Amino acid sequence: HPRVRRQRQMCIRDRAKFDKLVAPKGYPWKLTDILPKVLPAGENAGFLTPEGAKRLDVSGHLKAGVPVCPPEGDAGTGMVATNAVKQRTGNVSAGTSSFSMIVLEKELSKPYEMIDMVTTPDGSLVAMVHCNNCTSDLNAWINLFKEYQELLGIPVDMNELYGKLYNHALAGDADCGGLISYNYISGEPVTGLADGRPLFVRSANDKFNLANFMRTHLYASVGVLKIGNDILFNEEKIKVDRITGHGGLFKTKGVGQRILAAAINSPISVMETAGEGGAWGIALLGSYLVNNEKNQSLADFLEDKVFAGDAGIEISPTAEDVAGFNTYIENYKAGLPVEEAATRFKK
């Protein structure tokens, strides 16, 4: 199976390195002897044993014999939860950190340091861009406005505050009026920084107003994600039919979608179920194991039996927003030495 083959290729070097490191210990096993086999979605990974049932539930109510599907981490379950396992689909998770997963039709032309290669639960190749920072710095600025409102003696509804500030950002200039934000609570490997300092930068002649201020921080939340995905879409010419967004950035209806659509120049969909995340994703993989009577592919099973054609609410990018974000990201990349200097001189 392609998933098994790819996983073996990706892990063989690490296995050999591990075996070499533990060789002086004289263990009677190799790493491959004790690790479970890699299985694609839909394969039976075993059954819950009586001993296992007792460990999970000492009361004895949990019965043995439950079939077990192959496990997945956040990336795999996120793809399933957003119906993004088919080639030419993808998903973006945007919260405290962010990552995009684009399911490829073919391998990339060469390796890229900022792009990780993984697979869907059923074995398709996926290009992953992971960013350490997303909404944390943005949330810190929102909390500053919360403090100001409290100082005035005005009751604060956080949902209303987020909604008003996020939506006001859309009234700003498409290029944020020259304002730049680096949301680096921690370092960002994609931009080559091992450490980070949250930084807001402007020139005296930039258009400094609240709308542009909020817009630059929203742009910053997906700025690094854009840099990584520009490689896929502009250099590798990757094609996608649908990208689904999920996570806290999309909680204020329409705003995060529009910002992300401008960043990667692609329509973005958001589904009501996307917020369910990993637990729901692995439950769907369990359902695929036991309820796939028609022997469908995972993509077809999700499309027909789970989502039933529901692609969510889609927002397409405007030419003005795309051009503005492109200008913003050029200013952003040009200013990265300022961010790097901040990590050296601000402790």
Q: What residues fall within each predicted segment?
A:
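Intrinsic disorder/low-complexity segments enriched in polar/small residues
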Residues: 8-10, 31, 347
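ATP-dependent carbohydrate kinase catalytic cores
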Residues: 13-122, 255-260
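Single conserved hydrophobic/aromatic residue that forms the stacking wall/gate
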Residues: 1-12
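Glycine/Thr-rich phosphate-binding loops that ligate phosphate moieties of nucleotide
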Residues: 6, 37-51, 69-70, 102-347
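Short, flexible hinge/linker loops that cap or flank conserved catalytic cores
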Residues: 2-4, 62, 237
